């Protein structure tokens, strides 16, 4: 029985109890949201050691960190370190997007290195295996695609991105609807190219019921991928993006009827003023399915700083209903991220998520309240304890010391110290 089926029956599962306690919410409130499909729980039945995580409308906004090898750089130890660093700095989930090396062993190593839910994009493996054989990606058979999906499910991944909305119909529209950037989703492009080459329907769309059967067996959350997300600001909100979105909405409803948990992925690159409307449209089109966004990135001309451009968009998206933020690192659009890039990306995304969470959860606001108290007292030890990045706190304090009880920015001119001293004197 899946979490969705249990919730529909009125059952509060052990995973729901665990999550409700961690989130500080009523288990029954969580159950009702799961039953409606508004919240999903990541916990593959074969992933025994994972601490389940929920994403949806009654829990905190969550953050995902993407890691993984590439065909140019295969360093498994580095990827495991990235996973550990991401979790240390607050990532709620990890996606292994490896495309180089022994993908099966890499995936398993990452899964055993951390205790958070793991997501993948199975078609990456199907494509990589074609290249490893000296074949073109479009030579993938339907069995190759399905075998990759089932392998990931059996290995215990908790959610998978499946670009089921890249249909033959929408691919035909691509010939007419011109984009500035084109198609930037790797998995979506693999399927679009395959459709164009063979003239066949996307197997995941055509045989969606079979996909639901597989997902149901392992209680894997299907993350319905946005293969036609905008890859640049000029393409935001175009016909292709919206057509795919409505297809995903229909597939969400079919999954719920089958007892399978689903969430929907979203953009992408979006001008800042369009973000609220895009999120609200997505929520309506998908009947309030949990919405998982990459950014959105709000400007395209700051490569090297896209952890910041995405955090800005992520905060606005979350405030307007996005439930799950995929981090972006400073290396986005430039190359494979380093461990330090991962750390910076997670922190930026966590800032965006926390900025929204503190408006909804008293416990989250209390953290900021306590920091304000500590700052008002110039209590540096307490500020250190409350800091989300203690290493950075210490680094700056040591680099820029002062002999005063304030910081080296103001020293004896510190506004807080001056007014506190005067108030104490009466």
Swiss-Prot record:
Cofactor mode of binding and number, as noted:
Binds 1 [4Fe-4S] cluster per subunit. The cluster is coordinated with 3 cysteines and an exchangeable S-adenosyl-L-methionine.
Residues binding [4Fe-4S] cluster, per UniProt: 407, 410, 414
Q: Which family does it belong to?
A: Belongs to the ThiC family.
Instruction: Output the lineage of the source organism.
Output: Archaea, Methanobacteriati, Methanobacteriota, Thermococci, Thermococcales
Give the protein's biological function. Answer: Catalyzes the synthesis of the hydroxymethylpyrimidine phosphate (HMP-P) moiety of thiamine from aminoimidazole ribotide (AIR) in a radical S-adenosyl-L-methionine (SAM)-dependent reaction.
Q: Which organism is it from?
A: Thermococcus gammatolerans (strain DSM 15229 / JCM 11827 / EJ3)
Q: What positions does the entry give for substrate binding?
A: 66, 95, 124, 163, 185-187, 226-229, 265, 292
Molecular functions per Gene Ontology: 4 iron, 4 sulfur cluster binding; carbon-carbon lyase activity; zinc ion binding
Q: So which cofactors does this thing need?
A: [4Fe-4S] cluster
- Record-level GO BP terms: thiamine biosynthetic process; thiamine diphosphate biosynthetic process
Query: What is the protein's name according to its record?
Result: Phosphomethylpyrimidine synthase
Query: Its catalytic activity?
Result: 5-amino-1-(5-phospho-beta-D-ribosyl)imidazole + S-adenosyl-L-methionine = 4-amino-2-methyl-5-(phosphooxymethyl)pyrimidine + CO + 5'-deoxyadenosine + formate + L-methionine + 3 H(+)
